[in-house]
Swiss-Prot record:
Lineage of origin: Eukaryota, Metazoa, Chordata, Craniata, Vertebrata
GO molecular function: melanocyte-stimulating hormone receptor activity
Keyword Cell membrane attached: yes
Lipid-substituted positions (S-palmitoyl cysteine): 315
GO cellular component entries: plasma membrane
Name this polypeptide is given: Melanocyte-stimulating hormone receptor
Chain ranges on the Extracellular side, renumbered to this chain: 1-37, 94-118, 184-191, 267-279
Subunit details: Interacts with MGRN1, but does not undergo MGRN1-mediated ubiquitination; this interaction competes with GNAS-binding and thus inhibits agonist-induced cAMP production. Interacts with OPN3; the interaction results in a decrease in MC1R-mediated cAMP signaling and ultimately a decrease in melanin production in melanocytes.
Record field: transmembrane: 38-63, 73-93, 119-140, 164-183, 192-211, 241-266, 280-300
Length: 344
């Protein structure tokens, strides 16, 4: 489990992370050489998890409430929010349980603790896999919406999206169960690392291709209106910056965790690797940060979703407003029918 003095079963080959007395300090490795170790306070870890939990619950509630958002694209975004919710929730639950056990507040049998430990590990692993899968699914959906715009609604039908979502959840739960069961095999960790790299390559290829097509389209418009080329260059730079931010956040938040798994396989006893292992909780914190950032990138950019979210928040204080909107969108006349597969 990801706490001081405890560890995840998936990473059972690691030594327990020693307690650090400062937020940023130097810990000694086995030879006495200084080793940089960053300690994440439990309060900060739980606070970030709570922010992620609330944020993703709001996304799920907004999409579930507004029927205009019941398209394949928003189904993938909703499932991404749900998987991120489970990532943060499972880590918060695990952290809280360990704190209670260490404080002596929660007293139970070792067998019960082990069963709970295994269940939370499966939930955490499966939700992480789902989160990565739905990030890839959103990229594929947007790619189809751009390159097959005229056939998008016949390709990405809601039943097909629902079948894909069900397949992702089932495959993630089954594979995570196998991963936790055979956690001590190097092949398990390598499979996870390869899966992460595959998702990274998939997203990079699709988004780069989409950026290239967008630049070509912008260049065609510029030529049509006899404008100057610098405007096209500015568009390309903005698109490249957006793409860099999107992929950069994904890599920076998930990369350290999978680097950690890679080092577990190839240098479990190396002194430098042991220094990296001491910062395992930092890597988990980065993943929690990614679950906070995902709604900002994929959900809250949609004007329709933001409007529905405001209505959900208002109606949480004034329950009578649900009846005024007829059940679709809360306020009369606020429904905006989606007329295309454009991403939010």
């Amino acid at each position: 489990m990801p706490m001081q003095g405890a560890q995840r079963k998936l990473l059972g080959s690691l030594n327990s992370t020693p307690t650090a007395t400062s937020n940023l300090g130097l810990a000694a490795n086995h030879t006495g050489a200084p080793c940089l170790e960053v300690s994440i306070p439990d309060g900060l870890f739980l606070s970030l998890g709570l922010v992620s939990l609330v944020e993703n619950v709001l996304v799920v509630a907004a999409i579930a409430k507004n029927r205009n958002l019941h398209s394949s694209m928003y189904c993938f975004i909703c499932c991404l929010a749900l998987s991120d919710l489970l990532v943060s929730g499972s880590n918060m639950l695990e952290t809280a349980i360990i704190l209670l056990l260490e404080a002596g507040t929660l007293a139970t049998r070792a067998s019960v603790v082990q069963q709970l430990h295994n269940t939370i590990d499966v939930l955490t692993c499966s939700s992480m896999l789902c989160s990565l899968c739905f990030l890839g699914a959103i990229a594929v959906d947007r790619y189809i919406s751009i390159f097959y715009a005229l056939r998008y609604h016949s390709i990405m039908t809601l039943p097909r999206a629902q079948r894909a979502i069900a397949a992702i959840w089932v495959a993630s739960v089954l594979s995570s169960t196998l991963f936790i069961t055979y956690y001590d095999h190097a092949a398990v960790l390598l499979c996870l690392v390869v899966f992460f790299l595959a998702m990274l390559v998939l997203m990079a290829v699709l988004y780069v291709h989409m950026l290239a097509r967008a630049c070509q389209h912008a260049q065609g418009i510029i030529r049509l209106h006899n404008r100057q080329l610098p405007a096209h260059k500015g568009f390309g730079l903005r698109g490249a910056a957006t793409l860099t931010i999107l992929l950069g956040i994904f890599f920076l938040c998930w990369g350290p965790f999978f680097l950690h798994l890679t080092l577990v396989v190839f240098c479990p006893q190396h002194l430098t690797c042991n220094c990296i292992f001491k910062n395992f909780k930092v890597f988990l914190t980065l993943i929690i940060c990614n679950t906070i950032i995902d709604p900002l990138i994929y959900a809250f950019r949609s004007q329709e979703l933001r409007r529905t979210l405001k209505e959900v928040l208002l109606c949480s204080w004034w329950p009578g407003c649900w009846a005024e909107g007829g059940g679709d969108s809360v306020w009369p006349g606020s429904c905006v029918t989606l007329r295309g597969p454009l991403p939010p």
